[in-house]
Regions:
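Phosphate-end processing signature that detects enzymes handling 5′-triphosphorylated RNA
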Residues: 1-107
Length: 107
């Protein structure tokens, strides 16, 4: 289970622009049905928020400038991959990850 609290914004002039902010990203490996609540272990410190910018074309210049002024630059991050690594770390097992669609597990 992976849960997070999301705030989503969409462009008014560019409907293809979407920015999301995910807070309180949490995970668990038990109680996997949705009726078991939304608690879990934090993936990131409380003061960190994941921002994702989605657009079909190039990022608008005004947004590039605003992000650059705050020293925010593109980076890859996968909530699912990070949770998998944490799960393997807790199990004291090496994470076996690949870019393929094939499923892998902790060994």
């Amino acid at each position: 289970y992976i849960g997070y609290d999301r705030t989503a914004w969409a462009g008014t002039e560019d409907p293809e622009l979407r920015i999301t902010f995910d807070r309180n990203i949490r995970w668990r490996c038990d109680r996997l049905t949705l009726d078991m609540g939304d608690d879990g272990k934090r993936l990131l410190p409380e003061d960190q928020i994941l921002m994702e910018v989605k657009t079909l074309g190039a990022c608008p210049l005004w947004l590039c400038r605003a992000l650059s002024a705050q020293h925010i630059y593109p980076a890859s991050f996968s909530k699912y991959g990070a949770c998998y690594k944490e799960m393997c770390r807790e199990a004291n097992a090496p994470a076996r990850m690949t870019n393929s669609k094939e499923a892998h597990r902790c060994a």
